[in-house]
Amino acid sequence: MQPNDITFYQRFEADILAGHKTISIRDDSESHFKAGDILRVGRFEDNQYFCNIEVLSVSPITLDELTQPHAKQENMGLDELKEVIRGIYPNEIIFWVIQFSLKEYFNEEKCVREIIITDRKFN
């Protein structure tokens, strides 16, 4: 099984797949991604792969520099965004905004349908 390059909490999966969440704010340990990178994405809780994203940009930011547009790209309010970041990274000062777009996703139902249809072609 191929390892995931980045993980997201399961609660963000639907927003990513719907295109509502288009950035992720991370600490320095994930600042190495570059524009153009295609990342394999999994859920944090079980590391289950669910999509690929393309990195559009990576830029530094502080909590004080976060704006309403950042919150919108995270699909939440600004106060909620700051609270979530403080909860995940309580001792950090500088963060990295990873802007991304959805490239492709794994849909188990679609995959099963395609296998059934393909199987019918050969029988």
Curated annotation (Swiss-Prot):
It comes from the Bacteria. It catalyses: N(4)-acetylcytidine + H2O = cytidine + acetate + H(+); N(4)-acetyl-2'-deoxycytidine + H2O = 2'-deoxycytidine + acetate + H(+); N(4)-acetylcytosine + H2O = cytosine + acetate + H(+). Keywords: Hydrolase. One of its GO terms (cellular component) is cytosol. Residues 6-101 form the ASCH domain. Signal peptide: none annotated. Its EC number is 3.5.1.135. SMART domains: ASCH. It holds the Pfam family ASCH. One of its GO terms (molecular function) is N4-acetylcytidine amidohydrolase activity. The active site is at residues 21, 24, 74. InterPro entries: AC4CH, ASCH_domain, PUA-like_sf. Catalyzes the hydrolysis of N(4)-acetylcytidine (ac4C). Belongs to the N(4)-acetylcytidine amidohydrolase family. This is N(4)-acetylcytidine amidohydrolase.
